Amino acid sequence: MRRITCCFPIKIHRRQPPSPPSTITLSSYEYSSLAVGIISDLKEEGCDTLLVKLQKDANRKIGMGVGVRDRGILITTVVPGSVAAEKLKVGDRILAVNGRPILDQRSVVKSVKASGQRLYLQIARPHKVHK
């Protein structure tokens, strides 16, 4: 008696959990309430909130590095002589890019790359960093 073996591909479908949304939608009232709450919390922590305008320059890089830390998304490096060096400090916490709250490090990088000639960063800066 001969044995016949059949081989054919088997596809295994695994259910992936849904990805978290990359954007959130808030009404203007919800956004205002959220913003007021965040600013109050930051003041208690000893931080000021600043709106920083960076003008992109074709001859110079923005020159900043960002990273995830326990306090959020922070400026981790600033290249001397860069556009960022004029207004940002290592330790600044990024709250929003071009008016949009940031969710993670990827959203900061994506928003910075997608911005036009002007880049607006809402940051929280600890009082001890001010000069």
From Swiss-Prot:
- Which SMART domains does the record associate with it? PDZ (SM00228)
Coiled-coil regions, chain positions? none
| Gene3D superfamilies in UniProt | 2.30.42.10
Query: Per the record, a Pfam family?
Result: PDZ
Q: Which InterPro entries match?
A: PDZ, PDZ_scaffold, PDZ_sf
Q: Where is the PDZ domain?
A: 51-127
Please give the superkingdom of this protein's source: Eukaryota
- PANTHER family xref list: MULTIPLE PDZ DOMAIN PROTEIN (PTHR19964), PATJ HOMOLOG (PTHR19964:SF92)
Query: What protein name applies here?
Result: PDZ domain-containing protein C52A11.3
Q: Which organism is it from?
A: Caenorhabditis elegans
